[in-house]
Amino acid sequence: MELNKNYKLNKQQSRALTLMCQDKNIFITAPAGAGKTLLINHYCDYVRQHEPFKKIAITSTTGVSAILIGGSTLHSYLGIGLGDGTIEDLVQRIKKASKGIKERVWKELTTLIIDEVSMLNPVLFDKLEKIARIIRGSDLPFGGIQLILSGDLLQLPVVKGGGTGNKNDHNMEFVTDANSWKKCIGNNIVLLTEIMRQKDFHFKEILLKIRVGNIDQQVRSVLSQHMKKEEKLKKEEIQPTRLFCLKKYVQDLNDSELKKLEDSGKKFINFNALIKKYSEEAVLTNKGRSRCTDLQFKFLSDRFVKDSTTPQHLRVCEGAQVMLTYNIDQLSGLVNGSRGVIIGFTEMKFPIVRFKNHKRNNLTPKLNKTNEDIKSDSTSQPQGFPEGNRRVMENPETKVSKTDDEEMNDTLELEVRPQTWEICNDFGKKIGYFKQIPLKIAYALTIHSCQGSTLDSAEVDLSDTFEHGQVYTALSRTRDLNSLVIKNLCFDSIKCHPRALQFYDDIKSMQDAISEIENSLSELDFDDDF
């Protein structure tokens, strides 16, 4: 099987990929940072190259994770709204949605990928399974659609209630409790155990203990140390992003920090996203594009904006702390989640951001642009947005170089230019685009919104933890312990659901047994003439 040559598969990943390529249903589960999404992305790349006839839906249970994997939310893609109502109600809703387009989506679908499936209500999973059989006229599990599911039952749990089930039914707490789960997935469950996000063995060990609720003396000692080192990180120009449990605190902190800048006399610049439907000519010259009505485009573009981590309206000034919402250069570490501070604006009013960057030399060949290069890039796009991705370039007045300041010797200054995201219909055809500066204000985020993301530095406020897995999800966002500050942690708030723990004990036992059988078979010396 051809894969990216830079991507090496371990045994667990190889088994998962084999099952996916055999059109088997599968649940890929793992601790945070173990590469669940990366594995699925490589599978999708393989299918696009070798089996383009397959109709694959890439979805997630949350808008943030949907954007991270380049897909749509499950609810919007399948046309089920909030998922409330009876099965009959939902079938009728699907048939009427977009003049029957959603029904056609269900009928033509080959493979349904659901990321963060661990946050899917089990009652809703059962509804979707029955709906698939009704619409497709098939008695096969999920109507014959291949399911590729990924998630972690020990991170953030299912959102209970919401019209999809009885929030007091303790026997239906996880998607794996769904009545149709066993017939859909069976024993095709692969547990990935190799952590890729954190390279520090000590940090990995601590996180894995927290994940399963093993709060021994080592964990208490290490976490206590990181509750006392706040002053050290405060000296940095780029402050750690604060993670809160509640949205209210996030909005309050972001607003108050911007207000301080405004009161100090900083001048703000507004960037409004350009959202545009492709013209008839643009559709005719590209097979990957499709026509749509203005009403359809309005619906799909509104959905995109709602799910996007990039704000439609961005208001920033010099001194504002921001976060990248797009991967500019993965080799250099300039990726979705990289944080920086705006230090000025170019003549064309694009922000110059000073990013923390430990792999600066990888970008050296790109640091050669001039003002003339910028102007030449700006001739072919509408409404003042220059063409192309954001560029890494020299500021005409400020050379890109390391400073003599010891605290700033790992930084890099970039001009951040608009990025284009293409808006697709439910068949994967491109119908228009969303163009915006790929930045967001990043003094604070919710723990929920950063599940699946990696942060270069974080200060985690755990004063309002209320869910199983919430502390583990928050603490596993950074790559190392030195990038983490912890506030208001009560060790009793580190909770793991006992049934989730039992699920993983069972899976590990099953996977160990499979490995033992495979090792035994590989040691047998078969006679070729047998």
Swiss-Prot record:
UniProt protein name: Uncharacterized protein 030L
Disulfide bonds: none
Composition bias, Basic and acidic residues: 388-403
Chain positions covered by the region annotation Disordered: 362-408
Signal peptide: none
A GO term for molecular function: DNA helicase activity
InterPro entries hit by this protein: AAA+_ATPase (IPR003593), DNA_helicase_pif1-like_DEAD (IPR010285), P-loop_NTPase (IPR027417), Pif1-like_2B_dom (IPR049163), PIF1_helicase (IPR051055)
SUPFAM superfamilies, alphabetized: P-loop containing nucleoside triphosphate hydrolases
Pfam family, any one: Pif1_2B_dom
Family from the record: Belongs to the IIV-6 030L family.
Organism encoding this protein: Invertebrate iridescent virus 6 (IIV-6)
GO terms for biological process, alphabetical: DNA repair; telomere maintenance
